[in-house]
């Protein structure tokens, strides 16, 4: 469903294989360059009994939500890269997949090419997860890294990110933290078997970061990074927040360059494990979509959790020192 940047990457991967076949591509316009049937009629796809899996790479809320629900109700597995829908409708979509005995997998929604959710799922098979944390947005990491290493102002670093294709023409959802918050919500829901409401997550983006803040961090032997964090509380609630943080220079997170991500799991017994790689892009994201399809083909059709429960976000117990910039005369 969709054959743009990510969908085109999935198409190329499938064309190189002999064990998978694309039955249809859903597109609003003719695509004569594609070696498969192209249709603008979704009902043709969902009613075809030979189609076992719908791959949703359209993005956005509608019609992606309508199509995903229809596919699940028709008994078809769904693989999606749609972090917006999976953060907003997680509980509803997982429940719908369970009721229809099909798989719903969304590894590509978090971490791009990193097998983050799959590794999180594997950890949960062994032991409880206590915390998830890390750098979940490549655009903001590129901007902060460029400001740190090249001394550029925020606006210049943003323009450079846009020129390289790391930032959208309208980068608002990256800069205000919405993109990383969605990834954090999905990770939190999977890690703790819960449903967190996205608006409850405390969120601060990087739009207010200035070169003087980067310099102040350097004087303290620290590096500014946009960090996501969620931990399970004894009450069953979840502490969940996204904010710029000054990371000590010796930490792995401080050294993450350019548009890369680094996301970590803290398990009850194994401690902290980190996963590093490209956080976005045509082939990294398509790779995770393909891995989900292979998992389904190989019988790994269960959902990330089958015991969802509502969870309240409670950050009242989180005590941390903060850096505050004050404009004024030195006294």
What are the functions of these language-model segments?
Residues 51, 98-179, 186:
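Rossmann-like NAD(P)H-binding beta-loop-alpha module
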Residues 1-12, 328-330:
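Glycine-rich adenosine-cofactor-binding loop
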Residues 206, 271-273, 277-283:
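Glycine-rich phosphate/pyrophosphate-binding beta-alpha loops
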Residues 16-34:
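NAD(P)-binding Rossmann-fold cofactor-contacting core
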Residues 40-81:
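Rossmann-fold NAD(P) dinucleotide-binding segment
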Residues 64-70, 74, 81-122:
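Rossmann-fold NAD(P)-binding glycine/threonine-rich loop
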Residues 156-255, 260-262:
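Substrate-binding/catalytic subdomain of NAD(P)-dependent oxidoreductase enzymes
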Residues 293-331:
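A conserved regulatory-domain signal marking ACT and ACT-like small-molecule sensing domains
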């Amino acid at each position: 469903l969709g054959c743009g940047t990510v969908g085109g990457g999935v198409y190329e991967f499938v064309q190189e294989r002999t064990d998978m076949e694309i039955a249809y591509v859903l597109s609003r316009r003719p695509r004569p360059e594609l070696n498969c049937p192209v249709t603008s009629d979704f009902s043709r796809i969902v009613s075809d009994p030979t189609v076992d899996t719908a791959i949703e790479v359209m993005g956005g809320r509608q019609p992606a939500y309508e199509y995903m629900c229809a596919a699940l109700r028709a008994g078809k597995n769904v693989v999606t890269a749609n972090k917006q829908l999976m953060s907003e409708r997680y509980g509803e979509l997982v429940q719908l997949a369970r009721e229809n005995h099909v798989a719903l997998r969304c590894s590509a929604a978090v971490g791009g090419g990193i097998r983050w959710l799959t590794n999180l799922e594997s950890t949960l098979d062994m032991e409880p997860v206590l915390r998830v944390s890390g750098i979940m947005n490549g655009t903001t990491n590129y901007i902060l890294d460029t400001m740190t290493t090249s001394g550029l102002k925020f606006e210049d670093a943003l323009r450079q990110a846009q020129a390289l294709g790391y930032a959208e023409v309208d980068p608002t959802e990256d800069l205000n933290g919405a993109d990383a918050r969605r990834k954090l919500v999905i990770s939190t829901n999977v890690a703790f078997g819960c449903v967190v409401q996205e608006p409850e997550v405390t969120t601060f983006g990087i739009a207010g970061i200035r070169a003087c803040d980067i310099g102040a961090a350097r004087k303290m032997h620290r590096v500014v990074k946009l960090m996501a964090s969620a931990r399970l509380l004894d009450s069953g609630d979840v502490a969940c927040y996204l904010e710029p943080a000054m990371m000590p220079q010796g930490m792995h997170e401080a050294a993450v360059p350019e548009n890369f991500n680094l996301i970590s799991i803290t398990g009850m017994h194994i401690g902290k494990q980190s996963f590093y790689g490209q956080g976005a892009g045509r082939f990294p994201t398509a790779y995770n979509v393909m891995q989900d399809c292979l998992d389904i083909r190989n019988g790994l059709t269960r959902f990330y959790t089958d015991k969802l429960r509502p969870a309240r976000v409670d950050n009242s117990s989180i005590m941390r020192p903060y850096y505050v910039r004050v404009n004024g005369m030195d006294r």
